[in-house]
């Protein structure tokens, strides 16, 4: 798909300064490792042993209430989940719940359309759980951004993937470029 999007930009007459994927070790890896280090320094990352139901197809842990009546992932019905116990790093998402709600309700963080804003606020009425942000090298098959200071772990893809917006403009590898382009005036996130 990456090649198709690259070709589409050319067909539309668009040009770009950098074409980047999450596997980019020159730009994205250092940016993601810097993000990790900043979060760690702020006390937002901790390591703990975790046991849960794991869907290999989604590469995600699920709570029982997130599964269908047969105890299967909705995306992969018919495939049994694995009970996995491993030590991972977690991000203290719970620490930021009230700040996120305030940013949205005050209008400082705009979400459109209104129905999506209401969807997010409805979700935020429940306590946010801290989220696992790493996988063992074995589970990750040594793919992904290495966790700084721990050669047994890789960043979970959804921790580093969103950082690609910043890494593309220099975060973690070119401060002059980054300070010129960030923060962006508008962020567009597509949902398929």
Label every PLM stretch briefly:
Residues 10, 44, 60, 105, ...:
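Residue-level marker of positions within ordered structural domains that often coincide
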